[in-house]
Amino acid sequence: MPLWIAKEQGIFRRYNLDPQLIYIIAGRAMQSMIAGDIQFGLLGASHVTNAVTAGGDMTMLLGMEDKLNYFLNVRPGIKSAEDLKGKKVGIGTPSGSLAMATYVGLDQLGLVPRRDRITLLNTGSTPERMSALFAGGIDAAFFNPEVEQVVLQQGFPMLFDLGKANVPYQASGLVTSRKYMRSNPLIVENLAKAVIEGAAFVQNPANKKTVVDSIARNLRLDRPDRLESAYRAIADTVPRKPCPNLAGIASVLKLMTQHGINPKAAELKPEDIADMSLCKKLDDTGFFNRVHQ
């Protein structure tokens, strides 16, 4: 959402930038970034971890979501965690934040996939996961707050709010390569500033109507109650000082190791995944405070 707003409100232009916003599933986005086709991405720390352990130089410079802020939506008829036993749950890509959210969420519900005969299916991107749920290919899946309202509007109720568990987890952040940061420091700083201003615009109550209109347009929501829920969830998601959360990254590394997703994650420190230098500069110069004045 901060990127949509930064684009629509001309914030990028104020920094002499005109980025093309492209929706690509996170795993493919990272591949494109490694290839040099894309310079920036909003990706989870799990994808950065996979890139780093494979020898890449990707790093996270802003932290946009520092907890697992997902909702579990289910097909009609599923009323409790017990009803999920023997069912199929879509997890997106095997090593993404959505997969991690699913593991943690099922654990919070007292469920163990193998013991409870829950089949975890790699359903791909968010639109593909939605289609699988709507068509009956899966029985449940976790969705982020914006998309959850679309799923709810289609008649698939929310069973569990993982965000209320407050699990520290760097679910999303602004990612680029360390090489690009060194070669293009002004572009990196200006793009980060524009994204931060976009987030501050979303969080400012005076801009609520503009933000709600953007949500309605981009997510094709029309019911006022759904729009209000989506707005509230989005406005509350991004920290006022969106720096990478080292504790949240440590949680990512631990979960990836525990679930056998990437054993090499155990060899890394949070600082191997995040570059805090730009955030420190913006904090020291008072930028974070100024955008919220």
PLM regions with names:
Residues 1-125, 129-135, 139-145, 158-168:
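Short, glycine-/small- and polar/acidic-enriched structural segments
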Residues 20, 27-28, 118-121, 229-235, ...:
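Short linear loop/turn motifs
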Residues 50, 54, 64, 70, ...:
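Amphipathic, soluble alpha/beta structural segments
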Residues 109, 127-219:
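Pocket-lining segment of extracytoplasmic ligand-binding domains
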Residues 182-265:
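Secondary-structure end/capping motifs
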Residues 253-293:
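Conserved C-terminal helix/tail region of periplasmic/extracytoplasmic solute-binding proteins
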